[in-house]
Amino acid sequence: MTSRQFIVARDDLQQSRLIDVALPATDNLPVDGLLLKVDRFAFTANNITYAMLGDQLKYWSLFPAPNGYGNIPVWGFGDVIASRHPNLPEGERLFGYFPMATHLIVEAADVSKRGLRDGAAHREGVAPVYNAYTRVSGDPAFAGRAGDYQALLRPLFMLSFLVDDFLAE
């Protein structure tokens, strides 16, 4: 199985391409690893900001890409299609930060009934909000059209709290 990824040149966002990356078999996922199938995501001007500040704010480190290229991060939904974590079954639906790709491997850490954190080493050093995934299976606030609105607006809601905290300092 492969993941199709949309990547951009980090120094010229107008240069893009699609690449296919081989995915490991379930048995070869990291311990507590999840293979997520990206279902849908929002793409807004906010995502262009992530790309423009990718080096300074470490956004490019979230989703590794070939040298000189990057995966623009997006907010959206993914479904667990393979799991090596005992408390995260296949079929679980998650909301969080994804690459513009068909799949993502997450190393589940700090798992709770509400969500988890991606504990992959390459994701260290970024704001915790970008490593958090919310469990949304069965939550009507994330179903159908409501989910589309969540993908568009929830990141702005979270940003408002981060800006408030920053200004308070």
Kindly give the residue locations of the regions a language model identified.
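Short, Gly/Pro- and small/polar-rich lid/capping loops
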Residues: 1-10
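NAD(P)H dinucleotide-binding glycine-rich loop of Rossmann-like/cofactor-binding domains
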Residues: 97-169
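Cytochrome P450 core scaffold surrounding the K-helix E-X-X-R motif
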Residues: 46-52
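Short, well-ordered strand-loop elements centered on a beta-strand within folded domains, enriched
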Residues: 16-20, 88-93, 112-117, 121
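Hydrophobic transmembrane signal anchors and adjacent membrane-proximal interface regions, especially
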Residues: 5, 18-20, 98
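Residue-level "hotspot" positions that anchor or transmit function at local structural transition points
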Residues: 26, 68, 148-151
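Glycine-rich beta-strand-centered segment in the early N-terminal region that forms part
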Residues: 29-42, 55-105, 110
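A short N-terminal beta-strand-loop micro-motif at the entrance of redox/enzyme domains
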Residues: 10-40, 45
